[in-house]
């Protein structure tokens, strides 16, 4: 590919990925799962976790996935996102974080997503942008897969609190960590 595209290879790949994710039947998930084909060359954009460790080559490829985290990402001149997580350079998750001690909650983050985030911004475009957007504070987490202004629907992404018939919404309180610590301990 370098021989064909020379110094424009990186820009060509990025443009091709963008075109594939934004076309009518395209999506970021499809591009991640199936890769892209450029000039009859297949380019894998992510490696899934192999079911077993029998094939060391697949295990090695999986370990080469690069997850990165960026704080304060500007999606446009007017939209700054608290945290964005990338997989091999492609934005897959966004987070609006609020602090209960400062008088804010996940509800403020939901309001921000509904009113301050343009669903047509490339980062938030349905199917082509982030796969999931999280609104969270130190006690609760909510998520949506599609930003749609005031019509954006958020689902709780909490562990639940209590056991059996006495279980309730939210997350358990812990003495030594935040109620939402499962997000970085178990999910991410």
Predicted regions and their residues:
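ATP-dependent helicase/translocase motor core
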Residues: 1-188
């Amino acid at each position: 590919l370098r021989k064909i595209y020379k110094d424009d290879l990186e820009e060509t790949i990025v443009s091709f990925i963008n075109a594939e994710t934004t076309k009518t039947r395209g999506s970021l998930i499809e591009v991640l799962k199936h890769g892209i084909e450029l000039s009859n060359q297949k380019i894998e954009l992510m490696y899934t976790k192999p079911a077993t460790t029998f094939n060391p080559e697949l295990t090695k490829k999986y370990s080469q996935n690069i997850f990165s985290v960026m704080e304060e990402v500007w999606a446009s001149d007017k939209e700054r996102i608290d945290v964005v997580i990338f997989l091999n350079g492609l934005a897959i998750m966004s987070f609006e974080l609020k602090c209960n001690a400062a008088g804010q909650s996940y509800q403020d983050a939901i309001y921000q997503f509904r009113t301050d985030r343009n669903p047509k911004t490339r980062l938030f475009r349905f199917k082509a942008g982030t796969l999931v957007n999280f609104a969270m504070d130190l006690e609760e987490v909510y998520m949506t897969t599609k930003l749609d202004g005031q019509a954006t629907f958020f689902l709780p992404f909490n562990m639940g609190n209590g056991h059996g018939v006495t279980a309730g919404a939210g997350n358990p309180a812990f003495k030594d960590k935040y109620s939402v610590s499962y997000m970085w301990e178990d999910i991410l």
